[in-house]
Amino acid sequence: MDKETFAEFAVKSTIETTLQEALDIIDADDGKSWEEKRAALIQHLQSHKEPVLVDALADLAVADTMGQQNRNKFWSYGEIFCPDSNLLLRDVVEADRESYMAMQKEYSIMKSMLNEEAYCTMVWNEHLDPKALMLTIEKAGTYVGYCGIKRTVEKPWEIAIELLPQWTNHGIGSVAIPAMMSAIRDRLGESEFRVRIDPGNLASQKLFDKLGAVPNGISEFLIHDQDALEQCEAEHLDQIDDHLIAISNKFNVEPRKLLSHVLEYKLVCR
C-alpha cells in the first residue's frame, strides 16, 4: 500500500457507503422538498456510528452565522497580494469550480464518487461552506490551488492547502500559508493553528517544518471505530519501515499507530 494512503484506507469504505446512501436520499424522485430531504438525510445519518462523519455531512445543509461573519469580516479588508512571488489570495468564485474539481480528481480518496454529479456538487458546496474560510491562490492570473481554514467555528483553526500537480514544488505553499496566517491574525485575531498531515506526505511535512510547525501528537482521520482502526493496522504491519519508525519517534507514538492516524502539528503566527 502506498504510504500516502495509510489513514485514507481506514476511512474509504465507510465514507463511500455512507455517501452513496446520502446521495440516494437526495436524488430520490419522490416529490419531497429539499427541506424534507434534508430532514430525512439528517435522520439517516444520526443512526450512523461515526459522529464526525455525521456532523460533516449534515453540516453541508446548514448555514452557520458565526462562520459567515468571520468570512465577511476577513474579506472586507480585501484580497492579499504577494508581490515578490506574484501570488494573489482571493475569495472563491464560481469560475474556480472546474479547476478545483480537476484538482479533486487528482487527490481525492473518493475518486470513483466524482463520477456522480450530485457528489461533485456536494464537494464544491463544501468548499463554499460559510463555516470555512477558503482562499483561491492565483499566480499571474492563473488558478493554481487554494489554502484556507476548514472550520472557523472550531478552535484551533485547521489549515488546508492543495495545489494543482503542475504547481507543486514551486515554493507556492511557503509564500501563501504565511501570507494567509498573517492576514487572519491581523483581521480576525487568530494566531494559533492546527495542521494535520498523512505520515506518507513528506512534501507537506517538510513545508510545515520549514514554517515552524511543531509536532503535537496524532489524531484519527474521520473514522473513530477502534475495531476498524486496529484492523487497518494489523493488516498493514509490513508497511512499517525505517522512515515510519523515524516519524513515530518524532511524534512519540507507536509506529503501528501511523498506519491508521494522521500527524498533528501546532503552528503559531508570530
For each predicted feature, which ranges?
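Acyl-donor (CoA/ACP) binding surface of acyl/acetyltransferases
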Residues: 2-8, 43-98, 105, 138-270
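N-terminal acidic leader/helix
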Residues: 6-18, 22
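Charged, low-complexity interaction regions
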Residues: 24-36, 47-54
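Amphipathic, non-membrane alpha-helical rod segments
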Residues: 37-41
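A short gly/proline-enriched turn/hairpin at secondary-structure junctions
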Residues: 104, 108-117
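A short local loop/turn or secondary-structure capping micro-motif enriched for an aromatic residue
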Residues: 109-110, 120, 153-155
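Active-site rim helix/loop that mediates acceptor-substrate recognition in acyltransferases
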Residues: 114-135
